[in-house]
Amino acid sequence: MSLFTLFALAVALGTDAFSLCIGIGIAGVNRRQIALISLTVLIFHILMPLLGWYAGGFLGSKMGQAASIAGALLLLYLGGKMIWDTIKPGKDEGPRFVITNTGGLLLLSASVSMDALSVGFTLGTQQVSLVLAAGVIGLVAGMMTFAGLTLGKYVGDWIGERAELVGGIILVGIGVKLFF
């Protein structure tokens, strides 16, 4: 596998994180949260191909489907919460971080990196260094996560009061898409 092909694969695997993080960024995140989410997604995108490589097809098919469903439900919840927080009376005006605990952060990271788990199964059949591939996939996904969160944050500032509604709609849309 050429380096160009590996990079293209990494970009394709990072698009879920990028688009999801635009929606999260719109809700309002600070620099620390951007760094934490980006680093966690980066780590998951390194570990998942390695896990896929070693775990085998059976585990991946079972865990992949359950994690996709859990991830879709999380996105629907987060998106619905963001929409509700926008339209409910008496809302506060400060930025909201929609992932409020470690479990949510880990589930988010796992849900956007499930494709990397599947890719790990197939990387073993290619002429590529697994460590190099996992590193490239992780770095690209981390950078795309950072870019999505940052873009969402500034788009959110620009849109103003209804930015969270837009972010919620994006998250619900991605959550629904994961079911199909």
Curated annotation (Swiss-Prot):
Pfam families: Mntp. It is a multi-pass membrane protein. Keywords: Cell membrane, Ion transport, Manganese, Membrane, Transmembrane, Transmembrane helix, Transport. The keyword Translocase does not apply. Its main location: membrane. It is found in: Cell membrane. It comes from the Bacteria. Coiled coil: none annotated. InterPro entries: Mntp/YtaF, Put_MntP. The chain crosses the membrane at residues 6-26, 34-54, 67-87, 103-123, 130-150, 159-179. The keyword Membrane applies. Belongs to the MntP (TC 9.B.29) family. Probably functions as a manganese efflux pump. This is Putative manganese efflux pump MntP.
